UniProtKB/Swiss-Prot annotation:
Keyword match Cell cycle: no
Family named by the database record: Belongs to the tetrahydrofolate dehydrogenase/cyclohydrolase family.
Catalytic activity of the protein: (6R)-5,10-methylene-5,6,7,8-tetrahydrofolate + NADP(+) = (6R)-5,10-methenyltetrahydrofolate + NADPH; (6R)-5,10-methenyltetrahydrofolate + H2O = (6R)-10-formyltetrahydrofolate + H(+)
Keywords for the protein's UniProt record, in alphabetical order: Amino-acid biosynthesis, Histidine biosynthesis, Hydrolase, Methionine biosynthesis, Multifunctional enzyme, NADP, One-carbon metabolism, Oxidoreductase, Purine biosynthesis
InterPro entries assigned: Aminoacid_DH-like_N_sf, NAD(P)-bd_dom_sf, THF_DH/CycHdrlase, THF_DH/CycHdrlase_cat_dom, THF_DH/CycHdrlase_CS, THF_DH/CycHdrlase_NAD-bd_dom
Protein name: Bifunctional protein FolD
Any single Pfam family the record assigns to this protein: THF_DHG_CYH
Listed SUPFAM superfamilies: Aminoacid dehydrogenase-like, N-terminal domain, NAD(P)-binding Rossmann-fold domains
UniProt-listed Enzyme Commission number(s): 1.5.1.5, 3.5.4.9
Organism: Jannaschia sp. (strain CCS1)
Protein function: Catalyzes the oxidation of 5,10-methylenetetrahydrofolate to 5,10-methenyltetrahydrofolate and then the hydrolysis of 5,10-methenyltetrahydrofolate to 10-formyltetrahydrofolate.
Any one GO molecular function term: methylenetetrahydrofolate dehydrogenase (NADP+) activity
Subunit structure: Homodimer.
Gene from which this protein is expressed: folD
Binding-site positions, NADP(+): 175-177, 200, 241
Amino acid sequence: MTEPQTNRTSGAKIIDGKAFAADVRGQVAGHVQRLKDEHGITPGLAVVLVGEDPASEVYVSHKHKATVEVGMTSFEHKLPADTSEDDLFALIDKLNADPAVHGILCQFPVPDHLDERRTVARISPAKDVDGLSVTNAGLLSSGGEALVSCTPLGCLMLLRAEFDSLSGKDAVVIGRSNLFGKPMAQLLLGDNCTVTIAHSRTKDLADVCRRADILVAAVGRAEMVRGDWIKPGATVIDVGISRVPHPDKPGKTKLIGDVHFAEAVDVAGAITPVPGGVGPMTIACLLANTVTACCRAHGLDEPRGLTA
């Protein structure tokens, strides 16, 4: 994996997640071509969308485009909003059994009458390329062969490229969600960091953050992390995303993260911006997970640098 492209602003290095994600997608495309040339195998990703949520339709379109661009087969299944659980599960069972499908994801949210946890549990853990199942969470926590949730995996890739080694680094993850905080902490622990998970009940949160060589913020509270919370020279990964009124353009909005960027950039050694930092890594890692799942399904060596 090449080092993430960076830009200099004040004292901090700005980690260009968009450029890094493009590099990951390029590596995935190379692995896909080798699977085709050497083994006659084309990785396949199936995406299931229930209903007509506009944002979900945009996300599914982006995933389809990215899948095709790296040479994989994209299977799209769009179901009406009143689809029953039985019918949804019948489709998932069919995809689980299809040897041409190596990765399956159901785009969330689903309509209220469907249960997201039951839906994730129905997907074969070997094809759970979103890394959301309790099976993959358990494998990750026990050091097993898991498919890892895409956003934490993307953050780990950025951090590995930033440091020669993560071993011995003090890392603080703000946020304890099953989707991000917990798997992020497990990944950092797996790379021999000393990890603290902070959350809404953490006492003296700012003091806890000031000890971190690596600070990962994922709580969804706009600009909560101030510049004086950050250890000088620390690497800051901002996973939060909030839409707020634009200060200079009445009636317009802008995206900001959990970290007060203008303050943090003068203190941190390196930082991911919002937007353009962590976000682009998510779909790139979804593609990487699909290649990994394909290789595992066929008993082939996994692509180096694209897994945890």
